[in-house]
A protein has these predicted regions:
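Surface-exposed loop and turn segments in beta-propeller and other repeat-based domains
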Residues: 1, 27-46, 86-106, 141-171
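Beta-propeller blade signature
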Residues: 17-20, 73-84, 132
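Short coil turn/linker residues within repeat-based beta-strand modules
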Residues: 21-24, 83-85, 137-139
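Structural signature of eukaryotic scaffold interfaces centered on beta-propeller domains
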Residues: 2, 45-58, 104-117, 171-185
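Flexible, glycine-rich surface segments
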Residues: 113-116, 123-189
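A long, hydrophobic alpha-helical segment
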Residues: 90-123, 128
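Conserved beta-propeller blade signature
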Residues: 5-7, 62-63, 119-122, 188-189
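Asp-box/WD-like beta-propeller blade repeats and closely related beta-sheet repeat scaffolds
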Residues: 9-72
Length: 189
């Protein structure tokens, strides 16, 4: 693909390769790669979670986060543009600190996901650890990213579905945003 092109996603669960003139060069229907009980999680709403569509130039693939709605398991799927390889699925490890965030954590139940080369970097908004998964070696690592300034774990919200209480919980607790890795400095930010 040319350097003047960009992959764009929309709510139809399609992604489009668009060049600098606005010409659509390629369309990929991500729904084709979802199971019946899966949802696509491409989102940059910082109040909920951040998980972008990623184009891996070296592997000629698109990567995106999914969740199985019955098991609540998160996975990153890798779709190869030329369709010469089958879809690869990389299951994300649950939080080491709060293994089940499906209830009690307000809007903080989805992971933030970023990509650097062959690594998936992710974290959970309710705790400060950073997790990595190498898609070539399947090596998994986690780093306890402890803060000296705030609690490293969000308190569980016990108020049920009361909107005002959920908002209060969100405002009164820390929220751990997506983590990026800057390779030239070997630093997470």
């Amino acid at each position: 693909h040319s350097l003047d092109s960009v992959w764009v996603s929309d709510d139809s669960e399609h992604v489009f390769l668009v060049d600098s003139r606005g010409t659509v060069k390629n369309i990929v229907d991500l729904r084709e790669y979802l199971d019946d009980k899966e949802q696509l999680l491409i989102n940059t709403n910082y109040a909920i979670h951040t998980s972008r569509l990623y184009y891996n130039k070296n592997r000629q693939s698109l990567m995106f986060l999914t969740q199985n709605l019955s098991s609540k398991v998160f996975a990153v799927k890798e779709v190869f543009i030329n369709k010469e390889k089958d879809v690869a699925i990389y299951y994300l490890s649950p939080s080491n600190i709060i293994p089940d965030m499906s209830a009690g954590y307000s809007y903080m139940s989805f992971p933030n996901v970023n990509y650097v080369g062959e690594n998936i970097i992710y974290n959970y908004p309710a705790e400060s650890s950073i997790y990595t998964l190498n898609i070539v070696t399947n090596e998994r690592n986690s780093v306890m990213a402890e803060s000296n300034y705030t609690s490293n774990i969000v308190a569980e919200c016990t108020s049920g579905k009361d909107y005002a209480a959920l908002e209060r919980h969100r405002l009164e607790n820390p929220y751990f945003y997506d983590v990026m890795y800057i390779p030239q400095y070997k630093m997470y930010a």
